[in-house]
């Protein structure tokens, strides 16, 4: 019998013998082949695991826990994940979390590296134009989920947040640019207490308070998820002030970046912060950033890397690197290679500081000028981009394909394997096609390179570089090549099936010996089978590396002498396996750790605190630097001050024995400037010929630089330009005869100069350079029409209207239209025999990008009438809207066309379109007593309604002012007998910056004028967009303190004594408006006080409260201009020689005199930048007593020396020493409600001795939405205003057809009975007195649905009516016996806040009980019926409905439409059958 112990020993020996040879050296790697049914969309490993996820095109999620040896489809609970995963996302900062986003509102999360998945629901599709998930940099359970609704280019983004891994989700807010976390990266604020303060801070890009268009977008934040403060707090991006036009934000390591673009320019401003509190605009040394023309690149812990597009046509850029706070950028590399998507050939070598590889274009001038192909070359930097050198294979230059042509996933060249770098490319003088490339490798971080394999390959690193694999990707193959000696020698193995490799990858840290290869058996997408190979190299070596197999301190960077190099104050080393060691490191998921040794401080360890000097050797001091008190009494003095250098934050260099550039040095007072002297300066320049055309190129907030550019054409067709507001003038096109100047109306940096022939010049950089262009024909000879038309969105799209056959003797001189998409480099014929053509693209009209309207003569003959045509494909085909067209105009969102009435050729018919496709005939009010309408004038429209002036007769120079509803089809009379001149222009002006304020002149003696008398004009003002008008209240005294010649009623204009102003029809220059878009609430005008406007008596008047009160500024006529957003106002005497001007720095409360010339001048005009934000003004005139004749001159008046500091705006936005919060008022109201809301503006206090320096007047807040009052309504169609403010049906006319809305919408249940009122389009009021919604009625055949909607039970009706009678009766009797008894007519429009006595007429205790008492008898008669209904209700037989519906609050309008969720419901507007509530591009407010 065999002993048991012997059996046991025998078994153990056999077991040992039977062990597989895994520990023995194998001749080749092992692999496993698996098939996947559909193409992989996304693939990634969880860090430090062999768990890999693959999302396939059919919506499945595949999972493997062993690196791809075995796969399973994740089905989730009840199999709901199958075929439902649209997007797979990995948490970038947490190695345990991933997210599978579905297509039907069901989404899934894993927090245990895909072992389990938990479903969460959000009824949103993941956003496509914005990040669908936004991650918190420190708390992985906090995520923002984003969905979006897009129309054309515009999206409304709905952001939700979770702080518990989607166990619960809450709405964060709606926005237009998405939301993000302030702590958006683990390195942001990681070393400060700030992280605790801003843990929950979120930032969102939201619409402007009044204008939901991109140029008004705001960046707001909340520390409480916008719960307690729905609007949030606006971020102060620039010098403690908010900025409009914010586009997006990005978290980049320790930096948070926001990009903004103003209206009228492509230039972007980039704002950077490291704490979310203090933001600074990044400076690029005079270089422009443009939209879609910059790329944020992989950055370091101490600087940002940005590539800026310089040549859009050829795809080249400039690489900039910032200082440590991201505020000042220096140029590192010129002519970087980019593709059309903005991808840049730039990559940092992984894990090694300071090594950067870029591809640059070697022939930039040939590419830009000659259209030749780019010659791309590769360069590498070992000193963080300070210097670059070519890559070398022996003595040959090497060029590698980079990011723009990458064919794998992950990094292009490197991995965490220290020092190993690979790439596909070629040697020679430039980079060739990818198909011609070979594989190259370096094992010294790019210092030297060697040829690895023929042909292009996909490649990957494993086991910290101990294994390198490659697979040819230019053909179908099953050959896998590998190297275990850093690419010096290669072996290969043949896999089972040939594939076209799609990706070759491994674990993120490249420490594993396992690789995953994914490929397809077919070259064509979607065909064939998709295969994965899991390849394992663990058996290739028998042993694990020991100490002698390593270089213990392999230097990561070498200097030019081959010695370890210093960067950021230290040298970097790694412990690395020797290339020829026959072992594997086999330390899976253990990342190689760098070893640092400190260096002595050198100049490279310091940076400029502000920015480099022009020579690049030193540092400029910041403009805010002031010398110590008592120093710098004169420019030659010196003082001890900062050097301008600082040690780069995070730099670890040793100061002892090194350089210390940040020590204080002796500074010259001349370089920091002397304090402002409080004086005004003037500069006079003379012209040989009179300037006849002068225009400003306005600078926007996002424009860099500080130029104030003026363009001039003189009478002898010479062109001049000034960049310093007329202090100096240049002639860049000297000798050229320039006779037309055309500014691009949508891009303020662009202007065109035209000659009489086919040649012209343009500038796109505000006149610093001019380039020639040619036109297909000479410009049109119609002098009243500009030859160029511009596209609102694309600045290079032009339409040219030129004169054809005008030099021939055929007599067929006509105009043809051509279009260009490349700023005139080439032209194509659009239409022949046109009068004009215009682009009609608008944000208000979705899909209108290619919409063009043209006026063309029928049958291409000038003797035939005009047709109005439109096309969306450049007239490959077209739509004919009207024959016998007279004219058409575009105003705001409306297109208005007038054509001859077929039934009466002497009359015109007006039509309107909102969408550019469908026109509707305008319905004029019946009280418009003009039988034959011969002329219309389309007036300014910025409030979602058209103001139209209709000529009263063929000879009359006046006519009614009518106003449309929000789609331009139905008009009501606003005001009669508005003055016009012979040219048809009307005395009508909207106040800039304030909603609804308009000033007009009316003819006060129409009957006498019709008999030949002279017109007597009266000035009237409206504060609610033409719904109500009043005479202007006169000041009590004139400028000299004397009384006027009529009896002034304080605060009110009367027929015998009011203020009258000279208006639009009398102006020399239509640009000289009463108001300014930046000087909110202010107007200046010339006029007089009396019963009508005088031709002879005229003084200058000013208001600073929107026209409610006026004061006399100075006696006599003056021209005026505003500066610095109203903080300085300048007056110059008009039509008389003078050498003096008058200015005010306190909104006209006081005036100072300044002598600007040694001799008197006849001043023809005073100008400044259109935004009125400059501190410079320009006088245009002639010297009157010059020895050499009356010299033509300009005089620059510079006020910048008057003040030394910028006004300070407190962080909390409240009023302070420099600013007040100002609310526009309505003269007939006491609650500051205008258009249903209260607005607040920041306005400088008149006595604050500082400058605004604010280019954009900013609405601080919409304080609240108000209850509706009469001021929120105007008279409806067929109704006319009465003397008491009410609206009454015009006698003999029927009520409007209110049921029409039911016919237009078959699903509609009810409609509102006509009340005589309609809401002012821009009002946002809620509740209160809704004059337009008094009573509803059921639509025909919808009585049952109506009753079901509005009915209440008998019990409810009993308690709603009977119970309050006792209380109401008691209070009513008490009021009746003690009130004054004056129950008179209730006048519409009288406020409820004039008296606060509880028994006054306006007291609710009086008005409400009286109404109830009046109904007592009717209620009493209803009691038996009610009792019966209660019984029936309880018995379940019938339900009695109420006879009247609930008046729902009116919804938001216009710009408030984007603020979804603010209002409870939306009321359909019977008038708005043609379109939706449109956005107003022409609004000036943010």
UniProtKB/Swiss-Prot annotation:
Keywords tagged on the record: Glycoprotein, Golgi apparatus, Membrane, Protein transport, Receptor, Repeat, Signal, Transmembrane, Transmembrane helix, Transport
Membrane topology term: Multi-pass membrane protein
BNR repeat intervals: 63-72, 380-389, 440-450, 482-491, 720-730, 761-771, 818-828, 1101-1111, 1142-1152
Cytoplasmic compartment segments: 1372-1407
Signal peptide (from-to): 1-23
InterPro entries, alphabetized: Sialidase_sf, Sortilin_C, Sortilin_N, VPS10, VPS10-sortilin, WD40/YVTN_repeat-like_dom_sf
Domain of life from the UniProt record: Eukaryota
SMART domains: VPS10
GO cellular component, as recorded: cytosol; Golgi apparatus; membrane
Annotated coiled-coil segments of the chain: none
Subcellular location: Golgi apparatus, trans-Golgi network membrane; Prevacuolar compartment membrane
Stated role: Functions as a sorting receptor in the Golgi compartment required for the intracellular sorting and delivery of soluble vacuolar proteins, like carboxypeptidase Y (CPY) and proteinase A. Executes multiple rounds of sorting by cycling between the late Golgi and a prevacuolar endosome-like compartment.
Protein's name according to its UniProt entry: Vacuolar protein sorting/targeting protein 10
Protein species of origin: Aspergillus terreus (strain NIH 2624 / FGSC A1156)
